[in-house]
């Protein structure tokens, strides 16, 4: 019940912690956890997953309506289709050359110094 400095601590009277001497934690050290977990028991919530399965399934999963054939896309679309990339590149607009703009760029700091 007495601490290392000789004073009596009455706040922990009658508990298991009152009978053990205090360890000096020091700077940056956390107090040890008092909860003990059995080795065979995992800390995960795996058991909670089994409980969720017994509940009602979501309404979205039960949507077993017939598929509308007008929404189904038939045909190979782009599969097994030869694509001429050279022709596709000609159809695209030409890209602007940005290298010229880079030469003209002067950061704000350098503009003020001049």
Swiss-Prot record:
Composition skew (Acidic residues), residue ranges: 41-68, 93-114
Intracellular or extracellular location(s): Nucleus
InterPro entries: Histone_chaperone_domain_CHZ
A Pfam entry, by short name: CHZ
Superkingdom of the source species: Eukaryota
Comp. bias (Basic and acidic residues): 24-40
Any coiled-coil regions, as ranges: none
Family: Belongs to the CHZ1 family.
Protein name (record): Histone H2A.Z-specific chaperone chz-1
């Amino acid at each position: 019940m007495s601490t290392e400095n000789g004073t009596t601590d009455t706040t922990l009277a009658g508990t298991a912690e009152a009978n053990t001497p205090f360890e000096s934690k020091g700077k940056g050290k956390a107090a040890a956890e008092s909860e003990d977990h059995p080795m065979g028991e995992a800390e995960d919530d795996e058991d909670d997953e089994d409980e969720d399965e017994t509940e009602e399934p979501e309404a979205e999963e039960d949507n077993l309506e017939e598929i509308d054939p007008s929404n189904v896309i038939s045909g190979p679309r782009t599969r097994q289709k030869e694509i001429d990339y050279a022709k596709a590149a000609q159809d695209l607009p030409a890209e602007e050359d940005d290298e010229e703009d880079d030469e003209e760029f002067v950061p704000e700091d350098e503009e003020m110094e001049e």
